[in-house]
Structures are given as structure tokens and as C-alpha cells.
């Protein structure tokens, strides 16, 4: 078994609309490949499915070897603050003119269908806090790449970080320890609290991606310390 992206899916990932650099996507794929045999993975922040292809590729490989891997990906598909009209990361082609709001769900659906990953990647459409409040399943891998404001980042940490199983991995995107490189909330509201809780230790870092391993506690119980 190789642990790099299968060439056909790498092509889809590179072509997909979104915000996942190829090297960080490969890292995401590697951690998903390690973890998916042990339980479902969950991503917060689907957008148009770019990172979901890296995760789904790992699921396809695990399932080809007899596994039953699945990746859930949560998004209300209305965009983050920085995706709205007038902001830096706005794309007018993902606006639904009828409702006058962003809607990345159709693009996501086309992207995942074209990649052939509809069986592996399951979209959960809704607010992260709402889905988290009703979530009950331990995760082999959690990937947070959702809203980058202070409150959304804090909510994502509180809602999801405790669902990682012991030995499981927690990947966080857009972590910028140096404020000159980017916004602070994923660093201050997710990355640091995860380490300070004592439940996580850092195992990998690449670009703005950080990968932590759960070293103590029980999935679903509040994070200690
Ligand atoms: N992982 C994607 C990029 C995600 S961009 C990629 O690889 O390209 C961040 C996404 O988080 C946006 O699509 C936005 O709609 C979503 N988001 C922001 N805040 C959210 C919230 N509170 N609940 C659900 N989704 C949210
Ligand atoms: Mg990101």
C-alpha cells in the first residue's frame, strides 16, 4: 500500500475550487489513511470539496482493502465572512441569485460526483454548532477548517475536539503562530487550547496545517485541564 494520493484523485483535488495547498492536502491524505481504518473522519468546512477529495481518497483506498471508511463533512454552505461579497476570498460564481446568498453545495456535489467519491464522502449541511450539539460518534480523525472568526473557531473547538478517540488525530488548518502570516483565531482558539487541555500532543506540522494526537481522555467526555 502506498501512502500518496492516487494520481486520478490528485488530479481532481488539484482542479477543485478551494483553499487547500497540494502539500498540505497530501499530509491530510496521509493522516486519513492512517486513521480511517479505526472509525469515521469528520471535516468542518467543506466549501467546494477540495480537502474532502484528499480525505475521500484515503477512504477509497481503505475500502479497497476491505474497510468501511467514511468521511463526514460539515458546512452550511453559505460561506465564511471572508468568502462574502466584497471580501478577499469571494467567488461570485458560488452565489445563488435566487436566495441572494452564497451556496457552495452544488459545486461540492459536482466535484465529489466527478471524483467518484459519493460513497465515501457524506455532506452534512448545517451550522457546525448545531451538528456538533447532536453528534455522538467517536472520530478517528477530526479536521477543522471552518469559520476563522474568533467565535466560530472557539465554537468549533468546544463542539468537536472532545469527539476524537484516544489515539485519534486532530488536524487544524490555517494555524498561524506569527500574526504577520494570517488571522489568529485558529491558532488562539483551537490549536493552543487543544495543547493546553493536555489531551493532545503535536505530531506534525506543514505550512498552516497542524496535526495533533489525542493522548488522554475518552471520546465525548469534556476535555480535561
Ligand atoms: N476545506 C475547504 C475550505 C473551507 S472554507 C477547502 O479545502 O477548500 C471554510 C468553510 O467553512 C466555508 O465553506 C464556510 O461556509 C464554512 N463555515 C464557516 N462557518 C461555519 C459554521 N459556523 N458552520 C458551518 N460551516 C461554516
Ligand atoms: Mg483553510
Put a short name on every predicted segment.
Residues 3-19, 25-225:
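S-adenosylmethionine/decaboxylated-SAM
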Amino acid at each position: 500500500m502506498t501512502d500518496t494520493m492516487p494520481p486520478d484523485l490528485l488530479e481532481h483535488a488539484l482542479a477543485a475550487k478551494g483553499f487547500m495547498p497540494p502539500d498540505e492536502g497530501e499530509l491530510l491524505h496521509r493522516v486519513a489513511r492512517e486513521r480511517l481504518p479505526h472509525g469515521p473522519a469528520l471535516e468542518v468546512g467543506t466549501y467546494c470539496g477540495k480537502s474532502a477529495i484528499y480525505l475521500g481518497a484515503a477512504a477509497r483506498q481503505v475500502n479497497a482493502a476491505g474497510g468501511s471508511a467514511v468521511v463526514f463533512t460539515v458546512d452550511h454552505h453559505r460561506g465564511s465572512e471572508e468568502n462574502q461579497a466584497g471580501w478577499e476570498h469571494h467567488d461570485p460564481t458560488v452565489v445563488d441569485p435566487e436566495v441572494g446568498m452564497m451556496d457552495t453545495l452544488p459545486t461540492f456535489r459536482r466535484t465529489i460526483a466527478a471524483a467518484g467519491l459519493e460513497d465515501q464522502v457524506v455532506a452534512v449541511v448545517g451550522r457546525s454548532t448545531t451538528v456538533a450539539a447532536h453528534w455522538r460518534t467517536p472520530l478517528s480523525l477530526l479536521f477543522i477548517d471552518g469559520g476563522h472568526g474568533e467565535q466560530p473557531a472557539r465554537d468549533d473547538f468546544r463542539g468537536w475536539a472532545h469527539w476524537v478517540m484516544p489515539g485519534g488525530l486532530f488536524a487544524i488548518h490555517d494555524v498561524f503562530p506569527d500574526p504577520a502570516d494570517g488571522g489568529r483565531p485558529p491558532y488562539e482558539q483551537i490549536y493552543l487550547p487543544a495543547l493546553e487541555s493536555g489531551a493532545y500532543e503535536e505530531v506534525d506540522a506543514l505550512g498552516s496545517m497542524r496535526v495533533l494526537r489525542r493522548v488522554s481522555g475518552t471520546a465525548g467526555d469534556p476535555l480535561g485541564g
